[in-house]
Amino acid sequence: MLSVANVRTAGGAATYFAADNYYTRADADRSGEWVGKGAEILGLDGRVDAKQFEAILKGLLPDGNRVGSEGRDHRAGTDLTFSMPKSWSLIALVGGDNRIIDAYRDAVKETLHWAEKNLAETRMDVKGREKVVHTGNLVVGLFQHDTNRNQEPNAHFHAVVANVTQGPDGKGRALRNDKLWAHNTLLNAMTMARFRLSVEKLGYEIGEQSKHGNFEAAGVSREQRDAFSTRRAEVLAQLARMDTKGPGATDAATLMTRAAKVTIQDRAALSRSWADKATELGFDATALIARANARAASNIGGVPTLSDKVQQLASHGKEWATAIAERLGVKQGDPLVPRDLSRRSP
C-alpha cells in the first residue's frame, strides 16, 4: 500500500528517516539513497548524508540558494510510504529472501521515475501571470525500514520528496505536490504491478488480492499474517471507537495509537523471536522459498520483464493502463488494477 503525508519539520524528519537503529537487516543501507533527476541536478548522488538531507528539507540548496519560506511556514517535503503486503515481509524478513525486498525497491524506484516525469510541477511567473508548469524532476531521499512500531516485520520504503524542483528557467523552486496526492492510488497500482512481475519471475505464486493493486503471497495464511500485524489491529480497534469514518480517519487512528519508536538493541534476538513465533504458527518460509525456486527453475526465463513498448506507454495514463493490463493478462474488473485506472492521467 501507499500512504502520503506532508513532512512538517526538516530536523525531525532527517533524524527519523536516516536513523540506523530503525533497521533490522545487518546489511541495510543505513543512510538511504538519493533518487531523481532533481537530485542529480543538485549533485546529490549515492548515500544520503543526514545533515545534507536536513538542509535540503529546509530548502537550503548546495549552491547556497534557498527555496520556499524560512521557519515554520516552510513545507519540508512529502513522505510517500510504500509498504509491502505482510506476507511478502514475512517471506523476506523472517525467511531471509532478500530478493523480494530488492524487487520491491526496484518497483518503487520505477514508480518514482514515472512520477517525476509526469507529476512534478511548480508555480512560476509566465508573461506576468503565475502559472503551474511541468518540471519533470524530483529530489527524493529513499529510506528502507524493516519494522513497525511494535517491532514486527514490516518492510517499507519512505520516499521523502523534498519541496524543491528545478523550473524550466533553471532555477530551484518550490514543488507543487498536488498530483502526488491525487495519484497515490495509481502510484501504488503501478508499484504492485511491477512487483508482481518480479516475484512471479522468482517463482512465487499470487494469493489473496485486494483493491488498489495489492496482493499477498500464496502459502501464507491470514492467521499467520494477522499474528505479525498487531500494529494494524491497534489502528482498526481505534477506528471502531471513532465517530469519524471519512477520509483521513485511518491516518488519525494511526497517530492516536502510535507508540514512541523504540531503539532496537539486539537485532539478532529480534530475528530469533520472529523465527520462534513463525514456528509456533506453522509458517515455513524455507519451504515456500524452495518451492518458488523450483518453480522458477522449471520455467526457464520466468515471466518476461516489461517490454520497451510498455515502458514507453507508461507515461500516457490510459495507454499505460491498457498496456500493463494486457501485459499482466488481467481483465476489466481485476482487483489488481483500480477500476478508474484507465481514466487517470497526469
Predicted feature descriptions by range:
Residues 1-345:
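Intrinsically disordered, flexible peripheral segments
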